[in-house]
Amino acid sequence: VIEPYELLEVNGYAVTALPATHGTRHPVVYIIEKDGKTIFSCHDSGYPKPPVLEWLGKCGKKFDLVSYDCTHGDMDPVEQWGENASHMGLKRNIILRDKLREFGLYKPGTVDIVTHFSHNGPKVGYDDITRLAKEHGFIAAYDGMTVEI
């Protein structure tokens, strides 16, 4: 069992779970590290709560890739439903990316990906998401996508 904020070694990967904002009992998102590369997988979650942001601000990691939840397309679910919104959209992804950069967690060339799309918001068609993502420096994920970092 992985506990929030604790590093666990899993088959050569260093995995740190962080509490997610989601409607399930103990949701988590992950920081995954291997061979000098670091990924922050923060999808299937809403915007991180203050304790998670505080931890991120002090963790000293440098992300090669960040995968963002974009369930709500071009909508900001925090504006719509409040801070307990269990998913994000592109507007909230931009806010989180700016915060991660402010914390110094980005390297030159960090890859930003949006994923976990659904019908729950405006402009959620893949063509819309791809265009909007590109306009803001994100890559829209697709089935079978691979990324070299």
Regions found by a protein language model. Give the residues of each.
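Cap/insert and terminal regions of metallo-dependent hydrolase folds
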Residues: 49-145
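Core dinuclear metal-dependent hydrolase active-site scaffold
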Residues: 1-58, 145-149
